[in-house]
């Protein structure tokens, strides 16, 4: 399992197999190409429906919105944290 955390404290734990998904790779590529409509799908593919709902609730503003920029930033931070966690877990002890 790999644990990732955003800078504001949202944490999620995933198996390494969750990252081995070509559909996730396609969705990440679309987000990288500035296709913001792929952002929600990317998060769901990465974390599943329940964890996605928790992230949305974590990012939700007082007026009930989940800002696109906040979600995009969270995705970047989670991917960065997953990479760091994967690298540290595979390093020799």
Each PLM stretch: what is its role?
Residues 1-5:
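Short acidic, Pro/Gly- and aromatic-enriched capping/linker segments at domain boundaries
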Residues 10, 15-93:
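Short, surface-exposed, charged amphipathic helix/loop patches that serve as local interaction elements
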């Amino acid at each position: 399992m790999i644990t990732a955390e955003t800078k504001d404290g949202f944490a999620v734990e995933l198996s390494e197999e969750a990252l081995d998904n070509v559909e996730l790779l396609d969705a990440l590529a679309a987000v990288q190409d500035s296709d913001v409509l792929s952002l929600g799908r990317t998060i769901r593919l990465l974390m599943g429906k329940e964890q996605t709902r928790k992230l949305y609730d974590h990012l939700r503003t007082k007026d009930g919105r989940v800002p696109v920029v906040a979600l995009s930033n969270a995705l970047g931070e989670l991917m960065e944290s997953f990479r760091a966690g994967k690298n540290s877990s595979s390093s020799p002890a």
